[in-house]
């Protein structure tokens, strides 16, 4: 991994940014160089094949290159924004004789609306809502959930780590062990909140929302899980949707499953129909139950996790998750 190659990445990024004219251009370049599958992360993955001395030296160079490219990205984004403001000031005219605007009535944000609908449904089924910390430790986020040390979600380029133990939680599943240790049986809870992962494109943002659901008692089985989730999805999308329940794998459930919805492509009928993943679920792994102080030979339970932005996007036939967080009033006024 020559040092010259890494230095050239900075030059390439600078040249590409100089030719960019819009924020969208800059963002595409940022993903190309700094994204999850970008040039920099490709180089980071090669470090493991080096000896310790070279690994330390090259790692330092890569981090410096990453920092330099990020700074170039910020500077170019700022410059384009300033030019856009200047152009707007020079071309737009203000008629001071126009009457003032009347106060506008606000609307509920689509994410908040989805959360309210989810909360109402599960509250009617007797689920109690609990809350957990967004700054989590590795035990509750990974270790107690039977997630192995070599799992990709533990990597630096996937998770926001503060140090070797503290991180921004990557899922709401960390609430499971806390609930098992502090809530008497039977357990029937949901937890709704923000989670964080290092990803940014039209399908992912660094912060998004999840709901975690869990039920533990004697004789809980997969049929109970499927019935509750199908009832919820039919309530949310309508009874005409087509769902698919299929086997999957998660380290904290056994057996594991995912539910897909058939996308009918209402906005583009030329596109073929396709299955879209909705949520992950399964029967809680015996190891996880034991970690929570529950005898896995006497009790069983299920758990599920649902991305709230994904539900909302499918409900309103949206294609870009980022619009939820851009504070665009023209977009928000639709809801």
Swiss-Prot record:
Record's cofactor remark: Binds 2 magnesium ions per tetramer.
GO cellular component, one term: cytoplasm
Enzyme Commission numbers on file: 6.1.1.20
Catalytic reaction annotation: tRNA(Phe) + L-phenylalanine + ATP = L-phenylalanyl-tRNA(Phe) + AMP + diphosphate + H(+)
Binding-site list for Mg(2+): 254
GO molecular function: ATP binding; magnesium ion binding; phenylalanine-tRNA ligase activity; tRNA binding
InterPro entries: aa-tRNA-synth_II (IPR006195), aa-tRNA-synth_II/BPL/LPL (IPR045864), Phe-tRNA-synth_IIc_asu (IPR004529), Phe-tRNA_ligase_II_N (IPR004188), Phe_tRNA_ligase_alpha1_bac (IPR022911), Phenylalanyl-tRNA_Synthase (IPR002319), tRNA-bd_arm (IPR010978)
Assigned keywords, A-Z: Aminoacyl-tRNA synthetase, ATP-binding, Cytoplasm, Ligase, Magnesium, Metal-binding, Nucleotide-binding, Protein biosynthesis
Main subcellular localisation: cytoplasm
Gene Ontology terms: biological process: phenylalanyl-tRNA aminoacylation
Cofactors named for this entry: Mg(2+)
Keyword NADP: no
Subcellular location per the Swiss-Prot or TrEMBL entry: Cytoplasm
Entry superkingdom: Bacteria
Keyword Cell membrane attached: no
NCBIfam families found in the cross-reference section: pheS (TIGR00468)
Assembly with partners or alone: Tetramer of two alpha and two beta subunits.
Name this polypeptide is given: Phenylalanine--tRNA ligase alpha subunit
Source organism per UniProt: Blochmanniella floridana
Gene name for this UniProt entry: pheS
